[in-house]
Amino acid sequence: MSQGLQQKENQLRQLVTEMQMMEGTVNTFQQRLQVVLASVSELRVAKQSLEDLKNIKSGNNLLVPVGGAAFINATLGELDKIVMGIGADVSVEMTYEDALKDVNERLEEMEKAQGSIEQQLGQIMAQLEAHQRMAESLSAEIQQAVQGSI
């Protein structure tokens, strides 16, 4: 086996190893993106719900989802205080305005995170595609060299 052929095979092995690492990174970014997208969706629902509740008079009946496609009848109280989860099973009471502001700020943060992850994912995908093209080219060169030596 010629030294040039051996060098190309080593390059191909290196590319394959790098591609495997990139694929792992892509999977990690895709998982992170799914988590962020779920948060964005949840925050949009919270924002819309808070905005919609402001237009409903106190004392009106509502159907409140409790999970599993089940609902309960509830009567809307005053919206002067909203209980907001702040993480680690801790909740705080806020004014309506502060709660809406908090939801909007969280939504903005998650949308920025989404954009950042999508950008990084796009970059790593472009690198992966470039590596795949190089690997295909090297593989073809190796195959040609092997067939030429037979």
Predicted regions and their residues:
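Intrinsically disordered, low-complexity regulatory regions in eukaryotic proteins
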Residues: 1-86, 90-150
